[in-house]
Amino acid sequence: MSIAAKDIEPADIPGNLQGGEYSPYHVFSAEEWSRFRADTPLTLTADEVQRLRSLNDPVDLDEVRRIYLSLSRLLSAHVEASQILFRQRTRFLSMSNETKTPFVIGVAGSVAVGKSTTARILAELLARWPSSPKVDLVTTDGFLYPNAVLQRESLMDRKGFPESYDIGALLRFLSAIKAGRPNVKAPTYSHLTYDVIPDQFQLVDRPDILVFEGINVLQSRDLPADGKIVPMVSDFFDFSIYIDAEESLIHSWYVNRFMRLRETAFQNPQSFFHRYATISEDAARAIAEGLWHNINLKNLHQNILPTRPRADLILQKGPSHLTQTVALRKL
């Protein structure tokens, strides 16, 4: 079977993925991509997919068949190649006691685009490979500064922007993971209280694969003029995925999700956003629009979207919230 990017007419390729003969990506339609599944078995049920998907995300078993099984097969090849390279490098360096480090997959994309669903489904599929690898999933939410710190520094309206994260703690965590250390602590976050949970951690104990999900995980930093090594989060990734969609679609999904949450999670008196559950629908929608335009859209333009070309794989979603196009970086 031979499927190439040129099989798609240029008019069918989203403008943000077009790069002519100099494009670093192979681009496939979802239907063509699905054929790369080969004999990869479907190990999830419809009920499990429903449990894994986020609110307002219609991803179903058909989407898993079309997109995620081929992606699982691709990642299996990358993990196997990484293991071979690790053994060869260990022999080259005569390091007989070298500890195998986890294969780290970064998942990035805008708020409301569906990256959490992608990360959860991937983690489940990878854990069900015949080799039964140990797979952990960690999100960057826990590495946000606590609300008390953000309020003190006047950063609550910048929550989700790079400066709202404890980058030092984030880098120390990934460094420890890549060093193969046991029981590395990842701080946890409550979407109910909209805050980091004090003294509560997720223990990550030398997994074979770590799925690391967050909006800004592919972001780079300015390089110092003196050539000093400045680590970036993506330096610790073995493979990276960017979940993409047209801006107008993400906007619509964000507002619709906010309105759905108003009817569900926001009803809880403990919710940080409980006050929005009691106002009129028009007032709530106006607040959602304001949050989108004043915070999330700015973050998308300034910090998230510019990282898209750094991804190894881009999943481009369409109006139905399902993947329409897949772009895979050329080797």
Swiss-Prot record:
ATP binds at residues 109-116. The keyword Oxidoreductase does not apply. It comes from the Bacteria. Pfam families: PRK. It catalyses: (R)-pantothenate + ATP = (R)-4'-phosphopantothenate + ADP + H(+). The keyword DNA-binding does not apply. Pathway: Cofactor biosynthesis; coenzyme A biosynthesis; CoA from (R)-pantothenate: step 1/5. It is an enzyme of class 2 (transferase). One of its GO terms (biological process) is coenzyme A biosynthetic process. Disulfide bonds: none annotated. One of its GO terms (molecular function) is ATP binding. It is found in: Cytoplasm. Its main location: cytoplasm. GO terms for cellular component: cytoplasm. SUPFAM superfamilies: P-loop containing nucleoside triphosphate hydrolases. Belongs to the prokaryotic pantothenate kinase family. This is Pantothenate kinase. It comes from Sinorhizobium medicae (strain WSM419).
